[in-house]
Amino acid sequence: MTKNVLVSVAWPYANGPRHIGHVAGFGVPSDVFARFQRMSGNNVLMVSGTDEHGTPLLVQADKEGVTVQDLADKYNRQIVEDLTGLGLSYDLFTRTTTSNHYAVVQELFRGLYDNGYMIKETTLGAISPSTGRTLPDRYIEGTCPICGTDGARGDQCDNCGNQLDPADLINPVSKINGETPEFVETEHFLLDLPALAEALTEWLKGREDWRPNVLKFSLNLLDDIRPRAMSRDIDWGIPIPVEGWQDNNAKKLYVWFDAVVGYLSASIEWAYRSGDPEAWRTFWNDPETKSYYFMGKDNITFHSQIWPAELLGYAGKGSRGGEIGDLGVLNLPTEVVSSEFLTMSGSKFSSSKGVVIYVKDFLKEFGPDALRYFIAVAGPENNDTDFTWDEFVRRVNNELANGWGNLVNRTVSMAHKNFGEVPVPGALEESDKKILDLATAAFESVAANLDQSKFKAGISEIMHVVGEANAYIAEQEPWKLAKDDTKRERLATVLWTALQVVSDCNTMLTPYLPHTAQKVHETLGRDGIWAASPQIVEVTNESPRQPIGVGLPDPEHTYPVIMGDYKTQLAKWQRIDVVPGTTLEKPAPLIAKLDPELGETGPEWAPVQN
């Protein structure tokens, strides 16, 4: 039965081009999942966009001497190009500085406000003494007052997991310039999380199939639940849609309140741009729809607590009750799929310190599937993992080139040389049946892993089949069979069997290696688009909804989005029979081996740090 599946991918902050650490956590895993779900016949909507509000972008715009909108435009385009080059198959990748996003965020806020879950309080706000500008929570560090760990942020301590306010920190300092912030009284709207705690707890305790680290962390957050400020003293952001506030350009909604609403606003924009303005409701109002949220572990709080609380409050499901908003009852996450961190040679990625590998540089030299493969087999799925050039070279050469590439090239080359086409097999022997049965069984077991976001387990099983197929060819020695005319039928059977296993493995590798899969599809003599690629489309800031207040987006503004026609691709999660008589051409090498020296030195643009 066809399922509706929403794939919500963390919104990258628009402060620079993407490095491989960014895409290891949210990018490649979410795309593998979405591509698999499409191949399984499900109705998939994959959305994301660039997150463009908040103080960090203002600070950077000042440094670069440009307007904040110009800076957002610059990095939005760079990120769109990076993610498209990597083959991330978004149905819509948009941005937060759109009229549609502003309007949808304001609708969520109004619903929460009308239901009594947005409360107004006087709080202490952090101000930079030298600039007078508000310091965001995450730009303040100090000692955690609960566990005593240094380096706790103004919103949360990563060591103990507790939520914090900047004023709680011991010896707080600004991460921007090291000065001690001033704390002044200011009026803000807070999301009344305690009034939603019972509903949150009930929902979370039903999430038994989540990754253990995510569920444990999320439940621990409930031990110290408190109201969280959802507005800021800042002039860059979404106006607060309340009388007396909406025209105050010095107060805007908190960037994290608006960013998580992006999954919903992007879905609404996708429906509008697709010509069916109500199509988004299939993914948000139908309780049978499954919704999966992909992110790094540092964003769990906002997706397992803040966003669900917003959805519950909007539907009037907290202790204060309330009315269901105009958008209807919106689905809570089915699963929050959080990855750990990818480091580089033992160090955290840092552009300023030169510890960085940019996606665009990587793609230019190695192409997308080498990176996609490394992230799949060695990425930070359940633990922090380290990228080294030595391991990258070893995996590309030993596994991709010598394993998968070798299987494809020698199988098709021998079939082409001896028959010029897919040969007609004779009677199958036990060895033939054994390798075919192994590939057949893998479809079901790999699917079970991918359906549970166990991407490493999935690709490990596929590569096991690849290894067994290479062993089968070595055992059958078709190059010897080719020298004996009396063994021609056996040669045909062995090569037909190997071609079928190549086809099967290619199908199962398609979510991981879509670009390579398209090449193999063509190498097997097949036509058409096997694995569709995303496209960059230039659009205008049109919106089915209109926001209110000051500082709104320009309705004539143009920007790039990522979209794609994935429904017409041929790839299905099932065996595609290789048809005898199909013409085969001599294949070009599928995967180039890398110079082993690269593992010791790294490329010029990202050398190994000694």
UniProtKB/Swiss-Prot annotation:
Reactions performed catalytically: tRNA(Met) + L-methionine + ATP = L-methionyl-tRNA(Met) + AMP + diphosphate
Source organism of the structure: Corynebacterium glutamicum (strain R)
Keyword Cell wall biogenesis/degradation among UniProt keywords: no
Protein origin, superkingdom: Bacteria
Gene Ontology BP annotations: methionyl-tRNA aminoacylation
Biological role: Is required not only for elongation of protein synthesis but also for the initiation of all mRNA translation through initiator tRNA(fMet) aminoacylation.
Protein known as: Methionine--tRNA ligase
Cofactor-binding details, from the entry: Binds 1 zinc ion per subunit.
Motif ('HIGH' region): 12-22
Lineage summary: Bacteria, Bacillati, Actinomycetota, Actinomycetes, Mycobacteriales
Residues given in the record as Zn(2+) binding sites: C144, C147, C157, C160
Stated family: Belongs to the class-I aminoacyl-tRNA synthetase family. MetG type 1 subfamily.
Recorded name of the encoding gene: metG
Transmembrane segments: none
Annotated coiled-coil segments of the chain: none
A Pfam family recorded for this sequence: Anticodon_3
